[in-house]
Amino acid sequence: MKKYNLNENYEFVGLWSTPTDPEQLIPGVLKYNAETGINLELEGSFSGEEFNIIHGHASGVNITVVDCFSTSWTMNLGIEGMYAPSKIVGNKIIVGTVIESLDELILEHVVLETSDIKPWSKLSGFSKPLYDDINERRKFSLTYKLPDEKIFYSDEEVDIGLNCSLNFPSTFPLSEDLVFRESNSFKITNKVSKGGLFHSAHVDAIRKFISLATRTDVSCRSIKMKLKDHEPYVFILANLIPINLDYKAKKLSDYDMFFTLTEVEERIQELYSKWFIFYCKSPESINLYFYKTKGWQHDFFLTKAQALEEAHRQINPGTNKWGYQSRVEALFNKFCNVMAHTGDAQAFSNIVKDHRDYYSHWFEKKRNKVSNGLILGYLSRDVNLLLEMMLLNVIGFDETEILKIVENCMAYRSYLEIGREHYPSSSERRHLWASTSPIENM
């Protein structure tokens, strides 16, 4: 079967039916669009408005559309031959098989291919070219050995391994276009034959874990599934909400990432395990960090400020009676080795609270206490940094390790002016939060 990518568009033309009435076959076209979603346009209509499963044989493949609902209203006048087209929206498409229900679906394993994460994983089968003549470099030897699977995570229900694959050009060597594509993928094995799409939470948790580590937007290229007692792979198409960090690295380099796999390989299972537990416990705060805001500066600030509160509440269950300012000040003091570069803890927490109160409820009495422009930009990014350090702490890094991580990240080293204390005081510096200095709009 051909490969189906989540970031491409597809159309499947054929006949469609429901499990409750398999004899009613309606012609139509199923459209998958990476941006707009899944739409089934039928030359007729099924009875009902919601459908757990819709079957199709289209464009030469068997297809199952999952979690569907009709967006059309059709008046059934009982007139034979009446033309009554309808449109149905779906949540997921399984390409390659027909199933009666998700509960009956037993997957042996799932293979998740992400966007390029090799600079993070350092997992490759290529060796560096060896030149016969180092001066002329006219002849070289290049060797390749498929690397062994790296254990990423394991528990009672699943095993997750990180693998490497090489797409070898079929035209080699009789072509000018010699494109070797090596990619990393995660194999998620269903150890207990759990029914349904058991892998969904891990797919999302993995891409967010690596996005945090790399400070970049990691996406899913494809998801293929091996069904029990079903030889070929099948593919799933779904519109995953894209990760879009407000503050991200310019490129995938060791100096722009928080950490690489090689730096934490001995403890990667522990780190991901803690991350997955928190992912399941506090999805709201995680989503506020990873998903795109509207683009206004106060939106950048407010989403991170709200995530900060929710994450702190989940991590510290005994603090339900704490006020917002107390949470921010406690986090500032917890990571004071880093946050000291931004100013005073009490001043910072007070300013964050005033801005949170105003932008979340538009309190008129707080209008004269809020900022915009450059000052709000500093405040938004400082809150974002505090949230990132809290997430790094959640997955297992202590305060000393986090200080080193931030200091080794060139973007934050420059932003926080770490090491710049030896520069002349007359040089332009970043804004520092201080209770003695009133905030001015800039």
PLM-predicted stretches and their roles:
Residues 197-215, 309, 313, 381, ...:
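A broad, structural surface signal
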Residues 4, 32-35, 115-128, 216-233, ...:
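Short, charged N-terminal helix-start/capping segments
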Residues 135, 153, 179-181, 228-230, ...:
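A generic structural signal for short, non-catalytic loop/turn and secondary-structure boundary residues
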Residues 60-70, 163, 175, 215, ...:
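Glycine-centered secondary-structure boundary/capping sites
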Residues 197, 206-214, 218, 222-247:
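Internal, well-ordered alpha/beta segment that forms a basic, Gly-enriched binding/recognition surface
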Residues 1-209, 412:
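Long, contiguous, compositionally biased segments that the model treats as domain-scale units
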Residues 113, 145, 194-195, 215, ...:
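Helix N-terminus capping/helix-initiation residues
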Residues 18-21, 34, 234-442:
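Amphipathic, oligomerization/interface secondary-structure segments
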